[in-house]
Structure formats: C-alpha cells, structure tokens
Amino acid sequence: MNSTPGDTRDAPAPSHPAPSHRQCLLPSVAHTPSVTEVTPAKKITFLKRGDPQFAGVRLAVHQRTFKTFSSLMDELSQRMPLSFGVRSVTTPRGLHGLSALEQLQDGGCYLCSDRKPPKTSREPGRLQRKSPSAGQAQVFQGGHEAPETSYSWKGPVAPRRLTLVKNGDPRRQQTVVLSHKNTRSLAAFLGKASELLRFPVKQVYTTRGKKVDSLQTLLDGPSVLVCAGNEAFRCLEMENDRGNRTRKLSSVTARSERGCWGPNAKQSVIHSRGRSGGKLRQVSLTSERSGLSDHPASGHRAWAGPALDRCPQDMPVPPGSLVAADDVEKKVCMNEDGSLSVEMKVRFQLLGEDTLRWSQRVGQASVFTAASGKGQDPREADRFCCRQEGYPWGILKPGAQGLGSYDGGCQEAFDVGQKSQPSYDIWRNPLATPEGTGPTPRRRWGLAKLSGCKSHWRQEANHRKGHDKDNLSRVSTPRHPRSVQPGSCCPWTPDGDTGSDTLHPVSSASSHNETDLESGEGLCLEDTGPHGSRPETQSTERALSDTSVSAKSREESSEGGGQLHRSSSQARVMASREQVTKGDNPCISTQSHLPLNHMGLQTEKYRQGTRGWEVSGEPELRLALVPGHSGSQDTQRDALPAPACAPAQWRQRKQKRPASVECLPSVSVPYQVAQKGHARQDHYYRDTQSSLDTALQMPMPQEREQACPGSPAPQSPSNSPSAGNQASEDLRSPFSSSLDLQEPQATSKATTIAVSGSDCVCHSTRSVEPAGDTKCQAHSSTPTPAHRGELGCLWDKAGTTPEPFSFSVLLDRCPEADDPRTYHDCCCLQAVPSSPLAAPSGQTQTSISEACLGGSSFCPTPPKEQTCFGRESASNGSTSSGHSRADGFAGPRRTLLVKSPGVRGSLEEREADGGVTPSALPYASPDAVVREWLGNIPEKPVLMTYEMADENTEVPSDGPEGPKEDSLKVLGEPSQAKQQPPEGATNEHPEPAGVLSGPGSVCCRLGGDLHPDATSGERLKAPAEAGIGEGARVDHGVSLCALPTKVAASTQIMKALLGSKPGRPSSLPEVSSTVAQRLSSSAGAFIACLARLHFFDESLGPLDGKVRLEESPKYQEMLRLFQTLWPGSELWQGQLDFSLRKLTSHQALLGTEDFTPTSSSGVDVSSGSGGSGESSVPCVMDNTLAPEKRDLPLKIPSQRPDSRNQGYPELVGHSTVSSVSQVRACATGGEETGKGGRKQTWGNAPEQSVHSTMLEGDALSEETEGRVRERLQENSVHGKGLPEEGVRVCSQEMLAAGSQDGAGSPEDTRVPTDEAGADAASGGLWPLDGREEPTESPQHFSESNSRVREHQSAHKLELGLEEVSRLDARGCKQACIKASSGTMAHKGSLDPDPIWVSKLLKKIEKAFMAHLADATAELRARWDLHDNHLLDQMVTELEQDVGRRLQASTVMEVRKIQSRAGRMVPEPPREALRGQASLQTEQRRRRLQGLRNFSAVPGQGPLSLTLEDGPTLKTALGTKSGAEPAEDEFCPCEICLKKKRTPRFPKDAATVSGAPVRKAFDLQQILQSKKGGSSNREAMEVAPQRTGRMLSQEDLGTVQGADEKQGLGVAEGEEGEGKQRLRAEEDPEILKTEGSGCCAPEEDEATEEDGEICIGTAQESQQLEGTEMGKEGTLPQSFRDGGTLEAPARQGTHSVEIQEASRERQQEVEGRHQDVKEDSPWVSSGESQGRVGSENTSLDQEGRLLNHHQRPGPQSHHTACSSRALSLDNSSQVSQKGSDGDLTSGDLKCTKAKNSRVLHAEKKVPVMYPERSSSEQEVPSSPRLPKQGKGEDEGSAGSLACTQVGGKVDGFGQDDLDF
C-alpha cells in the first residue's frame, strides 16, 4: 500500500482524484504536469501547522529528487518537529490536502501536519462510501485494516499503538506507542523496535509480508508489524502452525486490531452493520487474529482457518465475485464487557488457480481448525473446490481437511474422512477443539491436481486420529446407504447423512463413489454414471467397505492406544456368494457378515458426528474375511462371488474410485482400502514413498476374476483357507494404501498381503500404479499413475499404527479386458511382509517391498519409495504366463520390488499415468520444497537396516510355490521366501529388453522376455527366488528398513526434478567423459571417506560374512545417484579403497549393480561398451541373478557362471558384481571389457578400484608379491605347469586385478588377481594361492566370461591364491596382463612427469610473481606511494624472498615426485647417475642413428611408449585402467585392439612421450632404415640400445617390441609410431607365436585400456628380437623381455642378436636375468633356461602366461610375437608393476625429456642394468627382483622385473634406458 491511498482516505482529493473536485480546489498547474518538458525544480516552503514560530523548510522539489509524494513527506518528516511526522500537506488555508507532486506550485507555501486533514463537510458521505473499499484494499494488502482510516474518523484521539512481532517468533511481541521521537524517521522507528524486541530490527513487514519501506507506509499501515533483521520474512501463521497453536497475540494486539474481541470491535461492528451488505471492511475477531498468521502464503488471502473468516470485502474480488451475497452470514454478539463483536460466515467459491492456492492455505491453516476438530456441515464445506491431499504420502494433517471440488449437482458432504478431520470452519474458534479429539499431529498437505474433467473432488483426508481404542473396527458400518443417491456424486448414507454429517467411510465407497471422488483418480464421474461407479461396482464397493475391517479404526486405536486390535478390527466378509449380489446389488450384504462388534463400533462411530470425521472418508476396505481365515469364527470361507464387470467398468472404477474395490473377490479379501484423501489424479506420487501402501493382497476368487472380462481366464479361486489365518494377522498391518482392489485380485492367500496361490486376477492397467496402491487395477485410464493418496494413506496408517509388520503386496494385475493380451502375468501379488520396522515415530511403516514387474531381481528400494508396479510398458507386456493360480501354489508371485523415486513405473507407464513430472508436482515454492525436504530429515539418523536375503529367506519357502501363509504369519519376517526359480525362471526374470527403467528407478517391467507361458506362479517363484534367494530382500532391504513415516514429498520432488521425466527434457546435461571421470573420482573419494567413517556398516549387516562395500544398499543408492547425475562416468564401480571394500554384508544388492547408467536421453551409456544391447536395460540383467547365489556369494565359487544370467552375458557381469567377493577387477577388466559386459558392474570399474589400489597399491603390491611368490614357490608352479614367469605374471595379474577391481580389500586385491586371472582365462578361476591347485579346469576358460566372473565372485577371496597353479596358462596370462597393466597405468598416472611438473610450477611461480607485482603497483597507486623508496625496497625484498621460497618449493616437489618414482629402484648418487645417464644417452643416440641402417623393417616403427606413457595414453584415450571405455566394447581380438590403439597411440605417444626431438628424429631415421631393409641384426642391436633404456621404462613393451623386430626396434621417441607398428605387426606375431592370438590382443587391449603401453619397449624389443632373440629366449627376462627373447630364439636370430648387441648389453641382460633368477624363482627357472631355444619356447608359453598377467603391463607386447610378446609382457608387467608399486609409469618410462630420462635412468638403471656401471643399482634391484619373481605382485615385482628385463633383453646398458 502506498502512501497515496492513506492520504486518500484522509484527504478526499488524493485518493481517487475526481477531476471536477480537484480542479475546483487545486491550481491549474497541478492538472498540467509537464511530461515532455524537463521542468525546473520547484522552490517550495513547507510550514508547520499551528506553529507560527517555525521558520519553515524550503525544499527544491523535482521529479528526480522526489519520485513520489510519499518520499517528499518522508523528507519533511525528518525536517519537521512533528510528533507523528508529516502526515498531511495542505494548502495554506488547509482547505484541501495535496497528494501529488504535480499539485505543488513553484514558490508556494504549504502547511504540514501530523494529522490527517479534516474532512470537509462536502465530502463526508463520499468518504464514508469510499473508505470501505480503501480499507478493504489495505486489509488485503497489509493484512489488517489501515488504522489511519479509524483515525480519520476519530481524529487523533489517542496516540497510535503498534504491535511488533518478531519475525519467525510470534511469541515475542511488544507494543510501541508512536510518538514524535520514534516517528521522526523510519530509522528512528527501527531503533525503537530494536530496543523493544531486543534484537537489531532492519526491516519491518506487514503481517502479509509486505515490506514497510517508508515512514508514511508505517504510519498508514496495519497495527501489527513483523520486525525482522536481515532474514527473509516468515509468515506468522506458519510458525503458529508448527507450534500447533493458534495465533495468540497479546491482548493488546487483539484489542488494537479492530474486529477482534475487545472495545475496538464496537466501532468496526457499527460500521460493518452500517454497511449491512457486508460491504464495509469488517474483520471478524477471528479473522483479525488470524490476520497475524493467516498469510503464510500470501497472495491469496484466503488461507484456510482463521483467515477464512475474513470478509470477502477484505479481499480483492476476482472477476467473478468469490462471495455471493447469500453466502455471508453475520451475527452480532454482545460481549461480557459490553462490547459488540460480529461473527461472519462467508462461503467462498474459489475460481481457477485460486482453488489450488486456497487449498494449500487451507491445509496449512487446518492445523488450527484441526484443533477445533468440529465437523463442518458437509453442505457448507461442499462448496469448497479444494481437496486436501494428504501429506506427501497422502498423510492428511489430522486437523486439516481437504476440500473436494464440488459439483454443483452434487451436494456432496464431506466424507466421514472429512468429518474425521476437523471440518473446515472458518468461524470456529481455533482454540476450541471438539471433545474427544486432541490437536492432531500436523500433516503435510499436497494439492490435488484438478482433473481436466469436472471431477468432483472430495476430501479424501483420512483422519486416522481421534478414534478411541474402542473404535477398533472402523469398518464402514453395515448400514451403508444402500440407496445411493443416483443424482448425487457422493451418496450419503441415510443415517450418517444428516445425523453425523458424515458419510460412513464404509458406505463412502459406494455412497460417494468415494472411490471415484476420493481416489480423485478417475474423477470423471460421468463415465460411471451419476454415482460414478457402476451399480455393481458400487454394491461391491459397499460390500467391501462394509466388510472392510475398520483397519483404520485399528490404526487409529493403535495410534490412540498404541496397540492394534487385530481380531476385532478384522471384519470378515461373511456374506456367502448368495448374499453377495454379483453386481447389481447396490450394497453387498456382506456388511451383515462383519463382526457385530466391528459393525456396532463403526456404526456408533459413524453415527457420531464427532466420530464421523474420524472415519476416513475413504472406505478402508479390509476384507478380513479370508476363506481359510481362522480369525473370527463368523467369517465364512465362502467367498463372495465377484460381480462381473466390464473391462470398461473396471477401468472407470479404477479411474474413478481406486479406493473402492471394484469387484469383490469371491473370496473375501483381507484388505483395507484406505482411500487417503489423495486424488489419484494427483500425479504427485507420494505413495511412492509410502511403503507398498497397497501391501495387501486381495485374494480374489476365480469367479471374481472371471467376472471381470478383463481377466483372460477365470482365476483359480484365490481363497485359500490357510491364507485366511494369516490374513487376519496381516490385516493388522496398516495397509492404508487405498487399494483399488476393485480389480479382482484373486490371491488365494487370505493373508493380507500374502498372495494366495491363486493369482490375483487383476487387470493390469496400462497406467502405472504407484506401487503405493496395490490396486491390482492400475488405473490405466487414470492419467495419474500413482494413487499417491492411497499410498499416502498407507503411510499415514503405517506411521500411526504400531504394527510392526507391514506387507507390501504387489497385486497381480490382470491386463485390462480391453487389453486383449490380458496377460495373466499379473504382478502376482506377493505378500512381502516387510520385516517389522520401527518407524522413527515408533510406528511401523510398511516398508515397500517394491516389485519390479520386470521380474528382475529386486531392486533395493527404500520403503519410502513406493513400489511402482512396474507394469509392463503400456503394452502390458506382462507375460501371460498363466496366473500362478493355475499352479495353485499360494506362493506370492514374483514380487518385483521397484524402486521408483517418483513411483517410477516403466517409463511408458509413468508417462501414460502421468508419472511424477515437474508439472505434476505440488504447487509449492522452491523454498517450501527445500524447507520440507530439510524438515523431513530425521533428527536422529534412521538406522537403515537393510535385511539381506539371508534374513529375508527366513520365511520358509514352501517350495516352488513360494512363501506360504507361514511366511506371512511372521509379520516381521519378509513374506518372500526363497523360492527356487522355476526352470528358466531366472532367465525369465531378466527381461533386459522389457525393462526400461531410468537410472533413478530400478523398477523393471516384465519384458516380453519372460515366458508368457510360464505360470505366474513360476514367474513369481522366479522373481521371488531370484529376488529373495538372491537377496531380493537385499533389494527390499532398503524398503524393509524402517524409514521415517514422513517420506518427504520434497524428496520425491527432488528426485523427479533430477531424474529424466516424461514432462521435461533430459534432467541434467551430460558431462564429458573427462568431467565425468573427475566427478566420479571425487564421488568415489567421498564414498570412501564415508566408508571409513563406517557410514555403510549398518547396511552391511552382520560382520560374519565378508562383503564388499558396494554390497551396501546405502552405497549402491549413492552410486546410483551419482550415476544418474553423471551417466557418462564409469568410475563408479571400483573407486573405493580396497580397505573399504573389505566389508561384510549378507549380500550385495543386485538392484544397484543392475542399474545401468543411462544418458539423459535414456540411452544406456554402458551399452556401447557392453556389446550386448541388453546392457541398455538398466536393471534387468542384474535383477535376474539367481537368489540362491546371492545368498551365499562366498559359497558360490563353483556355481555355473551362466546359471543366473543364461543368455544374458551382461547379467553375468552384474551377478559377478553382486557376489561381494567376486573378483571384479579381473573379470570385469578383462572379460567384461572383452565381452562388452557392462562396465557398470562393480568389478568393471577398475578406475575406482584403481584409484584405491593406487593409494594402497604399493604396500599391497609388495605384500601380495611376497605372498604370491611364497605360494608359487610352495606350489612349485613349474611342476604344476605354470612357468615361473607365469607365476610372477599371475601375481602381477592379481595385483593388477585388485587394482582394477579397486573394489576389494587388500584380500580382495589378492583374490581379484586370481579372479582376474580366471576372467582373463575366461576358463576357470585359478587363484594364485599355491596351496591349492586350480579347481577350475581349462574348459571353464572357454566358458563365458560371465561364468568366470561368477566363479570368481563365488570364491575369489578363499580360492584366489590357492587355485593359481591350475589356471589355464593362457587365461592366467591374459588376466594377469590386463590386471597388471591396469594397475600400472593407474599407478603410473598417479605421479606426473617431473619435467612437466617442474614446468608447471615454474609457470605458476611466474604468474604469482606477476600478480604480486601488480598488487604492489596497485597498492602504490592507491596510496600514492610511487616515490616511496622505502616501499620500493620492501617490495623488492618481498618479491625476492617470495621468489626464492617458490623456487625452493618447486624443487622440493620435483624431488618428491622423483623420489616416489625411484622408490622401486635404489638409486646411486645422483651425480654418478647423471653422468652414467648422459653417457648411456649418447651411446643410445649413436646406436639409434645407426639403427636405420640395420633396421629389419625400416619403414615401420611401433610407437615406443614407456610405462609412464601407458597411463598417459590411457588418459588420452579416455580409457580407464583396468576397464574398457564404456563407449567401446572391449574386443579381445587383435584387430580391434589394433584399431583402438592405432589412433590412440599416436596421440598418446605424442602426449606421453617426452623424448627429446633428437630422439624422435633418430627414431624416424631408424624406421626409414628399417624400411630400407636393414638387417634385423643391426636393427636389433640398435633396438637393444634403445630398448635398454626403454625397458627400464617399459621393459615389457620393449621386449615384446623386440620380438616384433620390425617396429619394435624403433626408438622410444617414436614410441607412438612404434606402437602403431607393434599393434599392426606384433599382434599377428603374438597370435602366431603364442598360439593365443586372441589372448595377446586381449592383453594388448587390456594394456591399452590400462593405459600402460610398452610401445617403446615393444619397439626396442622388436629390434632386440633380431639381436636378442636368442638371448631373450635364454634370458629369464623373457618374463618381460622373455616373450621377445623367445620369439627371436625361435627365429634363431637371438644368437645373432646377442652377438650384434653390444657385449655390454648382453652382459647387462645376462646379469639382469641372473638377478631375476636369483630374485624371482620363476624368472630364474624359466628365463635363465629360456636362453636355450627350447626354453625360449617354454618362456614363450610362460611369457604368454606372463603376458596375460601383463595385460595391465605391455599391451603392445601382446601384439608382438606371442611368445616374445608374452614373455615381454611378463617382464613388462613386472617392470610396470615395479614402477606402479614404487615408480609411476612415468618413472619407468624414463621421462621423455632428457632430464626425465636421466631421472628414470637413475631409477631404472640399477635394476635394468645390473651388469653395467649401474650394477650397483642392479644389486639392490636384484633383491627386489626376487621379490618380484616370487610375488610378482603388481607393484614392486613388476617394476623390478621390467627393469631387469629391459636391461637384459635390450642388452643395452643403462644408457639405453636412460635418455
């Protein structure tokens, strides 16, 4: 409100200037404002009225200085000594006031007064007429009548008082009397307010949130002001609501506010009476009081509750008047003190958007009204369009009453549910509460989405509170209005209609078509007819409602008494079929069957008006009656025949009245339909979070099913007597979910949720139902997929009911009749009794066991998330595997738990249903959402105890049939029993193609994959088995854990906003692979920290089983979130430290593992790499894992790899992942990559593991090497057929695998090595443990990688080392190679090139110094100190000092890197090393120059990359060490590897190689010389020289390269080229030589992937091949150089090679080999002997093994001749490992730059050239070599081996290695 209005009231002229009047009074100047001209400022003198002594204030008034007249008055107030400031400016005679700047005349004089101008006699009437509207405007604007109006009438009788309320704390109030002192200016007032309230007041707001920004506004504003500091305004009512107390301002406030009780009321009353039409602004005392808090949401004043009483006049009137004349009732009362007070009742009809906002306010304000709890006359309330949505979960605020949209034709009284909630009566004193009801806990309100059709919304609020314990059965009273008023949308029960003003909840189903209105789902009543439901449906509904056990009453009672009344509350439908009218009877007589006590209680309660509101308006149909129900004896086993209903009817019903049971199952179904006041239309799926609200199964007779045309065939009678007993117990569970059980859901089990053997014949509706409502019928027609209201109800009840047990039952859905397919694969309702979980509130919440229809293994879903029935895609792809009913087993059908953040069903379904989309989200401000989100975070962390399969399996499995009633009997026990998946069931589960789940939702739709023929029972079994046995409960684990009853809608909102939804384009921009890697690395580090803090311990369960961290549901959920955010990142799987991985849990959750990252577009990110299109299916594969395997992951080692995922290799990968101990790295790195298996599997993310491995790798590698060596020695690997090289390689592989896996503890690392070997072998696991011989036979290698993974996963921890001896040599080699290479690459990547670091630090130093200079210059300029010599001196000294410090720190950092790089190799004094290095470098250069002449293949030169280069290459390639890039399938074949490498290597080589240009030039010459046809010998001689150097870095690669002579001989500088050649040439050779070409390519690929490419080595080794072939063959170096040597030996060139190679080199090589032999048993045995040609062959084989192990190491070597490559790989592996362990690959690599080379030479030379001057160094390396030989653990052994091999093989001196 601006000052003008205020002035207007006081001065007639200002308010609405009437030209005629003003013209008469005001000078003409005022009427001709100059708009176009720039007028000069007006010099005006302002005098003080009544003070002739005042000299006056002269101001220059101009539009620029004073924008408004109000600002001018503020200025005058500061200058004039007026007690209340300047409130009016008049002409000198005071005849009329001024209200506009234009009215001022230049040079004029005006009088200023602190009073409003007196009203002229001419205008009194006009003023009075106008004042009401003005008052109204102000009241609406400011929240209160403008006090000035009264002053204008009364004159300044008394000083004005203002009530100051502290922002956010309405209890702190102070009254201030305005005086001249505190109103001189706004600042003075703020100071006074600060003094009173005792905190700094910076801002003042009206109660409506309008900021008071000027003194005039303050003076003219309302009498109650909110004082705030710098924080934002907070609505008073919200604060009050939270406190659940009505606004109680001080009595002063009440009196000060007109319209409140107190003397002031008279005036307002008098005036209002004068304005009999209610036109005068009149605020009822309640409205006045509410004014303080009623504007929480402000803009629309009509907040429910006290504010509502505000007269319409107080609100701006929208185009259509909100209030009709006859909608206002007034009462004038005489107060005890003699004052008058007025009560006005106004019935508002909000139009358009106001309805939504109003409903929000009503919900918020309902707290006050709730306290009153008085039922509002439904007729009064009926007009309100707003319908209250329960809290996010459909939990209604106890006191809050939702407004249902009201159809004029329907006099729809609010349901009993409405009654249950205090009726919304704006006139009722908020403080008064109806007897018997205490203030109810506050609940969140959600706005129902208005349906497009004029659906009548009824309040569906279920008020669970307030029922006495005696009200055990709220079962709708038998006296349902059988006569439903056809005309009324909501028929009233005759007795309840007027007497209680509430409908009986029971009758509500029929009477209100409550299902229609309540569900809000298919609100279109027109479809069903006047009643909105077909008569049959109505009757059924009635019967159900009648029969429905007053579960609510129990819940209520439990809430009130905290205990459940099970038996009584369970009403059993006793009506015999005859009794039940199959369709037409409006009411099923079942009500009579209800236990009398229930009926009586209910009836009484319903009759009681006070109780009426208690009864939830939604019929809670809980048919306690179960045919075998042992509960109440009266229950008849006879099931009521279900009335036949047309599919259309079903749909309509489903749509219209989801809560009501459309068809009574012939067997009475124990279920409660709790229609929470959630409109199904509401797309805001709160039910998602509620545990399966529809956790109940509705056993439906075949007849019932038959009755529904929708069901393709009659279902076997669902009634199973045994189920009945359980049902009664189950009924206790608060399945508040309003089940639209209307669909016949025949569950033979009467158990509430336990599905009886017979399938529920639920028509699967196309629309996805929120899992929350178990309604069999997904309301396909209903656009709202989730009936969140229903779920919400469940939560409400669950929250309130102490019952520990909650079942989440997925009702089978029979396809709609309209769907010809009508697959019977109903989501078989599987009673999934969630283990009793204590909700934080102590109330048990039904955990949602979310079922994925996909049949995939259960995805872990927190209970908060509702299970979405992953209905088949809109196609209702549910396989029409006969309903399990055919099987007759009562076992629950596969319960697919789907974790759907927003009740995500299949995406299609959600779209059809209108899933949670931003558009469907509740109408709330972001601030509100965030606030709610934060508010819902439990004060104390909720212990998320995820029960694993073991626990879940507690439920006895009754056989393939599945869990029986017994399982249900134990409420705490999950009903799911491990079931053996029927044959093919497992295959059936995974429906990769069928499942389309977004990353956020693991829910899978049954895909066509499921065998349609398979009985639903089988399918159920399979899922149950898979899910249960595998730990479906693990998936459930999340759901099983008790979550706070409040699963915040805000959480769903956030998920909906983050996830890609139908309503909007991709959720988040996809990040580049680089960024994704960074993010994933950061996320991995974050998770690792959490793990170290034992954040995931609880979810891992008992520590008896060692399970990896990723098994933790929390961990998986976190990863899933990260993956969802950054789908491009592959680092997720393995980023945790091994130490973190050594965690225990019952089993890993499949769901997360199964989750396939998808891009924002929905494309499976990993599918490209996965190779199989299935990988695109997010969870199908993983979910299909066999449960039994899941249960005993450690015991599964031998289980057939394909058992779970037959036909789904991807699944295998996941399954591997799932088993905690499975070797992920090796399997995933080697096999998965090769297979294109998902990288997603935990094992598949070597990067993560690599990171952790890198951190722990060095220490672990040493330890592991030692252990491996010992074991290998014990095993006498040679005896077992594994050459020593193989042993070392294996150990390396193990280390590498561990690093790749990055998912294991150190133990895991060791085991992964074994597993990796197994994967690489793809044959069987061959642990390196020397104690046991390999259990797996080579045939296993031939088995699919998935099998290997499984085996690995099964016993990798235990059998890993033991089975090493027996691994297939080839598999061993490959796995080892991959693992080692991955490890090497990772480790190499850890330490950057010292030269690069040095340059970078220097750049930083320069930049900093420049910045410092700039800063000092700026300082000089600022303080004008340019000529200050002292300052100059200070600055100079500072710069010098800083420069010295920076340089010193730079040197230190470089030294650190160098020292880390040189760890593995003892380095001699730097000076000696440098000299040696320089000599060697010169020699090498000379040799290289000559190489061109000797090069066997002049033109070709493989890129020679040092180990360091490998990681760099890897980075450049974007591949992750240990894992194939997600985008590219990993193909083990050489050709693919070549393709991948060729393009990458050049880049990588260029990037990686730091060789001097001279070297590169030399290398080119060498290549040319080779092309020229130089003899291999010459080339090899040169190569050895270079190789010596290279080998130190990439000895392995060099050796391999030597084998490949052609390109291998190329100098390192050409590493890129050499590498390319190697790939082209070496690969074939390797294949030929090794005989395992694929393996070699795999190794190469692995090497590439690992990022360790020993290209340079390969090149050198190629050259060496000719020269050193014999030597290599003989030399133990073959492990590294061995392969190369062997090949040359075969070629017979080795002897020549040796001869031609410089004697120094040979000596060095020999010495190194000797050292190796001494150091490493396998090296000595194999390589030393390898010198002989025959031994070369053996070495070749060994090399092969080594190569496999080496994969991580030299990949290019694989391409080299197989034997040569293999041995080379082995050696390179060793070297790499050595470098990895101690040196970064960069170190081994010998920095490209001379300096780096020198450094590397220093580091490497000792090992590489034992015989040479570096022999000193060699000596230390020798000891290391033995370690390597023994353990050949990834780190030290590899590097040492590499170094040695490099020296020996190269035959070069250290010079060769050093640059």
Swiss-Prot record:
<feature type="compositionally biased region" description="Acidic residues">
    <location>
        <begin position="1641"/>
        <end position="1652"/>
    </location>
</feature>
<feature type="compositionally biased region" description="Polar residues">
    <location>
        <begin position="130"/>
        <end position="139"/>
    </location>
</feature>
<feature type="region of interest" description="Disordered">
    <location>
        <begin position="457"/>
        <end position="593"/>
    </location>
</feature>
<dbReference type="GO" id="GO:0001750">
    <property type="term" value="C:photoreceptor outer segment"/>
</dbReference>
<dbReference type="InterPro" id="IPR036572">
    <property type="entry name" value="Doublecortin_dom_sf"/>
</dbReference>
<dbReference type="GO" id="GO:0032391">
    <property type="term" value="C:photoreceptor connecting cilium"/>
</dbReference>
<dbReference type="GO" id="GO:0045494">
    <property type="term" value="P:photoreceptor cell maintenance"/>
</dbReference>
<dbReference type="GO" id="GO:0007601">
    <property type="term" value="P:visual perception"/>
</dbReference>
<keyword id="KW-0677">Repeat</keyword>
<keyword id="KW-0969">Cilium</keyword>
<feature type="region of interest" description="Disordered">
    <location>
        <begin position="1227"/>
        <end position="1255"/>
    </location>
</feature>
<feature type="compositionally biased region" description="Polar residues">
    <location>
        <begin position="535"/>
        <end position="551"/>
    </location>
</feature>
<comment type="subunit">
    <text>Interacts with RP1; has a synergistic effect with RP1 in photoreceptor differentiation.</text>
</comment>
<dbReference type="GO" id="GO:0042461">
    <property type="term" value="P:photoreceptor cell development"/>
</dbReference>
<feature type="compositionally biased region" description="Polar residues">
    <location>
        <begin position="1567"/>
        <end position="1577"/>
    </location>
</feature>
<feature type="compositionally biased region" description="Low complexity">
    <location>
        <begin position="870"/>
        <end position="883"/>
    </location>
</feature>
<protein>
    <recommendedName>
        <fullName>Retinitis pigmentosa 1-like 1 protein</fullName>
    </recommendedName>
</protein>
<feature type="region of interest" description="Disordered">
    <location>
        <begin position="426"/>
        <end position="445"/>
    </location>
</feature>
<dbReference type="GO" id="GO:0030030">
    <property type="term" value="P:cell projection organization"/>
</dbReference>
<dbReference type="GO" id="GO:0035556">
    <property type="term" value="P:intracellular signal transduction"/>
</dbReference>
<feature type="compositionally biased region" description="Polar residues">
    <location>
        <begin position="499"/>
        <end position="512"/>
    </location>
</feature>
<feature type="region of interest" description="Disordered">
    <location>
        <begin position="868"/>
        <end position="920"/>
    </location>
</feature>
<feature type="compositionally biased region" description="Basic and acidic residues">
    <location>
        <begin position="1700"/>
        <end position="1720"/>
    </location>
</feature>
<feature type="compositionally biased region" description="Basic and acidic residues">
    <location>
        <begin position="457"/>
        <end position="472"/>
    </location>
</feature>
<feature type="compositionally biased region" description="Basic and acidic residues">
    <location>
        <begin position="1616"/>
        <end position="1632"/>
    </location>
</feature>
<dbReference type="Pfam" id="PF03607">
    <property type="entry name" value="DCX"/>
</dbReference>
<feature type="compositionally biased region" description="Polar residues">
    <location>
        <begin position="1756"/>
        <end position="1778"/>
    </location>
</feature>
<keyword id="KW-0966">Cell projection</keyword>
<feature type="region of interest" description="Disordered">
    <location>
        <begin position="115"/>
        <end position="154"/>
    </location>
</feature>
<keyword id="KW-0844">Vision</keyword>
<keyword id="KW-0206">Cytoskeleton</keyword>
<feature type="compositionally biased region" description="Basic and acidic residues">
    <location>
        <begin position="115"/>
        <end position="126"/>
    </location>
</feature>
<feature type="domain" description="Doublecortin 1">
    <location>
        <begin position="42"/>
        <end position="126"/>
    </location>
</feature>
<feature type="region of interest" description="Disordered">
    <location>
        <begin position="700"/>
        <end position="750"/>
    </location>
</feature>
<keyword id="KW-0963">Cytoplasm</keyword>
<comment type="function">
    <text>Required for the differentiation of photoreceptor cells. Plays a role in the organization of outer segment of rod and cone photoreceptors.</text>
</comment>
<dbReference type="GO" id="GO:0005930">
    <property type="term" value="C:axoneme"/>
</dbReference>
<feature type="compositionally biased region" description="Low complexity">
    <location>
        <begin position="716"/>
        <end position="728"/>
    </location>
</feature>
<feature type="region of interest" description="Disordered">
    <location>
        <begin position="1"/>
        <end position="22"/>
    </location>
</feature>
<feature type="region of interest" description="Disordered">
    <location>
        <begin position="1298"/>
        <end position="1350"/>
    </location>
</feature>
<feature type="compositionally biased region" description="Polar residues">
    <location>
        <begin position="1336"/>
        <end position="1345"/>
    </location>
</feature>
<dbReference type="InterPro" id="IPR003533">
    <property type="entry name" value="Doublecortin_dom"/>
</dbReference>
